[in-house]
Design a protein with these regions (language model features):
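Glycine-rich phosphate/pyrophosphate-binding loop and the adjoining helix
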Residues: 1, 24, 29, 62, ...
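N-terminal beta1-alpha1 ligand-phosphate binding loop
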Residues: 2-30
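Cysteine-centered iron-sulfur cluster-binding motifs in ferredoxin-type domains/subunits
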Residues: 8-17, 45-54, 77
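Hydrophobic residues within alpha-helices
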Residues: 19-27, 93, 131, 176
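N-terminal beta-loop-helix "entrance" segment that forms/cooperates
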Residues: 39-58, 154-161
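Helix-loop-strand module that forms the ligand-binding subsite of alpha/beta enzymes
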Residues: 60-146
């Protein structure tokens, strides 16, 4: 089994990366393979709404990094999306992925999705809701934890001081692993 973790934050290796890797630790303990993608390293243009992707399983526009990232999403059993807010790159990924999935029905069906946010104080629920709506609209299964899938902190590393939030991420990783084993 494989889980792709996508850091939508513009801050590479910041708080969002820390919480995704915290979830990865729990998945790795159960023998689940993980791969980390930093969207800050990937150029993703907005969707052109050409619908040429219909029946092809991926976007036909190959001048940016979307097709490679989406191929990894399709090939994974589970997907973690993380963003402090819905960053422009995350928004482009969700928009284009949404169109590709809509015209290629079932391509993401029954995959497991987890949305997480690392925030200073506010905005996390909007980000988590947006990413969860992507999952649910594409017939995916969404894993939850003991509380909202958010951790608080501003400066890089501050999220590690949010003991409750980090414990929640660990629990989320354990829940994700349990669900993946039941699905597979």
């Amino acid at each position: 089994m494989k889980v792709i973790g996508i850091n939508g934050s513009s801050r590479k290796d910041g708080n969002t990366a820390i919480i995704i890797r915290t979830i990865f630790e729990e998945l790795n303990k159960r023998g689940i393979e993980t791969e980390f993608i930093q969207l800050a390293d990937v150029d993703i243009e907005p969707c052109r709404a050409c619908f040429a992707c219909k029946g092809k399983g991926n976007c036909v526009f190959r001048k940016d990094g979307f097709a490679e990232v989406f191929s990894k999403i399709v090939g994974a059993d589970g997907i973690i999306l993380g963003s402090a807010d819905v960053s422009s790159r995350m928004k482009a990924l969700l928009d284009r992925g949404g169109v590709v999935a809509a015209v290629n029905p079932g391509i993401l069906k029954h995959k497991l999705g987890v949305a997480v946010a690392a925030v200073r104080r506010a905005g996390g629920m909007t980000a988590v809701d947006t990413m969860n709506h992507f999952f649910l609209n594409k017939e995916m299964i969404v894993a939850g934890s003991t509380y909202w899938n958010m951790v608080y902190g501003r400066e890089i590393g501050d999220v590690l001081k949010d003991n409750e939030g980090i414990a929640n991420m660990r629990n989320l990783g354990q829940n994700m692993a349990s669900i993946l084993f039941k699905l597979n």
